[in-house]
């Protein structure tokens, strides 16, 4: 299911109530479909339509996990800024790793 050779992605989903959910995966489309089918994170079940708000390459699994942690520590305002004005890289979140957005 999670090929260690596949690149990992960080993604953010917008819930109908405006909340942003952050996760990592090797296949964004597959993971979004799982969430929408109610087979993903329990926190998203029954929350309504989920919209992919942001995604970026995150490198290997280790970097993706660290990036996910850092993004989850951001305030709602900082997350909205990331979604609405994606930077070219997320290097400022993980100074030791180059993370490309887009």
From Swiss-Prot:
Record Gene3D superfamilies: GIY-YIG endonuclease
Domain (GIY-YIG): residue spans on this chain: 6-81
Xref: CDD domains: GIY-YIG_UPF0213
PANTHER family: UPF0213 PROTEIN YHBQ
HAMAP family: UPF0213 (MF_01029)
Family affiliation: Belongs to the UPF0213 family.
Name by which UniProt lists this protein: UPF0213 protein in potE 3'region
The species this protein was found in: Serratia liquefaciens
């Amino acid at each position: 299911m999670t090929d260690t050779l596949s690149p990992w992605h960080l993604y953010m989903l917008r819930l109908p109530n405006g909340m942003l959910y952050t996760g990592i995966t090797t296949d964004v489309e597959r993971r979004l479909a799982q969430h929408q089918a109610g087979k993903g994170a329990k926190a998203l079940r029954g929350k309504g339509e989920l919209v992919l708000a942001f995604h970026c390459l995150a490198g290997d699994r280790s970097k993706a996990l660290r990036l996910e942690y850092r993004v989850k520590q951001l305030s709602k305002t900082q997350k909205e800024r990331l979604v609405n004005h994606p930077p070219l890289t997320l290097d400022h979140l993980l100074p030791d790793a180059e993370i490309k957005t887009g």
